[in-house]
Amino acid sequence: MKRLLLIGCFCLMGWISLANHILIPMDNTQSNHLKAYGVVYHTLKKGLEVQWLLNYRGGSFILPFDADGRTECLLKGVGFEVIPPARLNAILAEIASPEVNADAVKLEKAPKIAVYSPKEKKPWDDAVTLALTYAEIPYDVVYDSEILDGCLKEYDWLHLHHEDFTGQMGKFYRNYRHMDWYKAEETTNKQTARKYGFSKISELKKAVVRTIRDYVSAGHPSRVYVCDVFGYRYFRYCFGCDGGRYL
């Protein structure tokens, strides 16, 4: 009799797991937003679908109930709720209402991410790589040589930030032109320019921007994020249009 009860309990737990979902809120109730993104990423890596609820509780996520996912949330301090089918249907119905500015977007693939940044920088020197490292989301650092060698076709997502694409090296010239790190960066850029047949750093940077433009124009399913005001303006000028999104 005890054996039958035990088997029945396991079957019931399995049925509940299949029926329920995990809601990861991204509003002020969330205790660790960056780690939450990491949980979502690793859920996608396992081949599971995720629903991104735009404008619902800060852009929350719905994950299939998965024991490993639940454990990951607990270990990483990510706030979550286990919700039954009725609650999920109510949330989706609320989002679908024409009176509500919200939507549910299905996520099916964990993107392969590249961050445009000098190789000599450490993850903690850069806000983007620091955030991705903390969230435990894998990424590759790429720079001018990799882009000109055609690496972009390997990635779904390219992040650009704090880059002066004019190649004038004037962003820190006044205060830092005598610093060793500034001189080393200038020397490296000049060497890279010569490697690809350019006489000036500005020509190198223009070629990099145009390579990114061609990559996006070819219809690759990627997103390009730009986070530097001046760099964005020059990037847009070379694109001839708003090819990226300015954050």
What are these regions (language model features)?
Residues 69-82:
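Short amphipathic alpha-helices in soluble, non-transmembrane regions
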Residues 16-21:
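Boundary at the C-terminal end of the N-terminal hydrophobic targeting segment
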Residues 23-25, 157-162, 223:
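Structural motif
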Residues 30, 35-39, 45-49, 56-65, ...:
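Aromatic-Pro/Gly-enriched surface loop or interdomain linker
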Residues 170-247:
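A glycine-rich, often tryptophan-bearing local segment used as a flexible ligand/cofactor-contacting loop or short
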Residues 36, 69, 124, 128, ...:
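Stable alpha-helical elements in mature extracytoplasmic
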Residues 4-15:
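Sec-dependent N-terminal signal peptides
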Residues 44-45, 74, 133, 216-217:
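Anion (oxyanion) recognition and catalysis
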